[in-house]
Design a protein with these regions (language model features):
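Glycine-rich, basic loop-to-helix element that forms the pyrophosphate-binding segment
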Residues: 68-85, 106
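Short, well-formed alpha-helical segments that are part of the catalytic scaffolds
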Residues: 15-28
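Catalytic core of nucleotide-sugar-dependent glycosyltransferases
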Residues: 144-150, 181, 208-212, 217-246, ...
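Conserved nucleotide-sugar donor-binding catalytic segment
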Residues: 140-221
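Short aromatic/hydrophobic "clamp" motif used to bind/position activated sugar donors
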Residues: 90
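Flexible acidic/His/Gly-enriched loops in nucleotide-sugar-dependent glycosyltransferase catalytic domains
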Residues: 76-79, 108-110, 116-172
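Membrane-interface aromatic/basic loop that binds lipid-linked glycans or pyrophosphate carriers
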Residues: 261-316
Length: 316
């Protein structure tokens, strides 16, 4: 019997408008690898389940549905789907995103030729709720090291291909379900960067639907704050796990400097912006921080920016 090469993890909830496009983009991939699509349908009140049932009837040997009742929530639904993935590799596609052609063939060929790589990932095109491309919005960049990822998540889950055996090791080592984190993927990327090798492929692999209602794109400041706090908890956990005492102290000191810099920006304290900006380590100075420091050098420009609010970068 041929080895099951790939499991595609699909988690979906209330996505009747998009789930057919998601499944079609996976089913239409050109390759000869044995594969399965494991779909976690999280007790949607809309017509998502009915659409999935129609696809299961057409592709009973490929699509493996998991119908939750009651609703499990994003994190538990995700790990339940992962637990049912039997392939050598796992790829992901949320029920409102879709893949671009040749993703499977490109990534599995690469992984088969590079056994030292635990996960590869690529670039996504942002789209809106209508499926229209957002101008100049792409996600995915070369951040393959633990230190780079600790500064923030830049890996689009819809573009990844990872080794299933390493996912199993991660779950045993970290037990993420007990942590209460609001992100299912970011902790795993951090763990992978320490226990294998990550590789960025500078190719568009998928389309990511950016919807205002999601936790990471919520327009509600309170929801955004809770999501950001969870990301910070994840970063602290892995910094403690993998850094020695000296490096951990440096990490916390830098985090505090960045926080003070942000607070100075909100309070429009030009002197403090310059003061804290100068001592933030070079590696931690994002493009946004560098731009702020450049612009605040001139008191006149600084005043104009805040009074007229010409440049959005100065708003929190």
């Amino acid at each position: 019997m041929q080895e099951l090469m790939l499991s595609v993890a699909v988690i979906t909830y209330n996505q009747e408008e998009y789930i057919a496009q998601t499944l079609d983009s996976i089913l239409s991939q050109e390759h000869n690898y044995p594969y399965e699509i494991v779909v976690g349908e999280d007790c949607s009140p809309d017509g998502t389940k009915k659409i999935i049932e129609e696809y299961v009837a057409k592709y009973p040997d490929i699509i493996k549905p998991l119908y939750n009742n009651p609703n499990k929530g994003l994190i538990q639904n995700y790990f339940n789907v992962i637990a049912h993935c039997k392939g050598k590799y796992i790829m992901e596609c949320a029920g409102d995103d879709y893949w671009l052609p040749r993703k499977v063939k490109t990534q599995i060929k690469y992984m088969e030729n590079h056994p030292d790589v635990g996960m590869c990932y690529g670039v996504v095109q942002y789209i809106d709720g209508r499926g229209e491309k957002k101008k100049s919005e792409f996600a995915g960049e070369k951040k393959e090291s633990f230190e780079a990822l600790l500064r923030g998540n830049c890996i689009p889950a819809v573009t990844i291909c990872m080794r299933n055996n390493l996912v199993t090791e991660y779950i045993k080592d970290v037990n993420p379900l007990e942590k209460g984190w609001l992100m299912e993927d970011y902790p795993m990327w951090l763990w992978f960067s320490q226990n294998s090798r990550l590789v960025f492929q500078n190719k568009k692999m998928a389309a990511y639907r950016s919807l205002d209602g999601s936790a990471s794109h919520s327009q509600d400041p309170k929801k955004r704050a809770v999501f950001s706090k969870s990301a910070e908890d994840i970063q602290h956990f892995f910094a403690k796990k993998y850094y020695d005492d000296e490096k951990l102290a440096q990490y916390y000191a830098t985090k505090e400097l960045v926080k003070l810099f942000s607070q100075a920006n909100v309070s429009r304290d030009r002197e403090s912006i310059i003061k804290y900006g100068k001592v933030i380590p070079k590696a931690e100075k994002t493009i946004k921080i560098r731009l702020k420091l450049f612009l605040v050098k001139s008191p006149v420009i600084f005043k104009l920016l805040f009074e007229r609010k010409w440049i959005r970068v100065f708003r929190k």
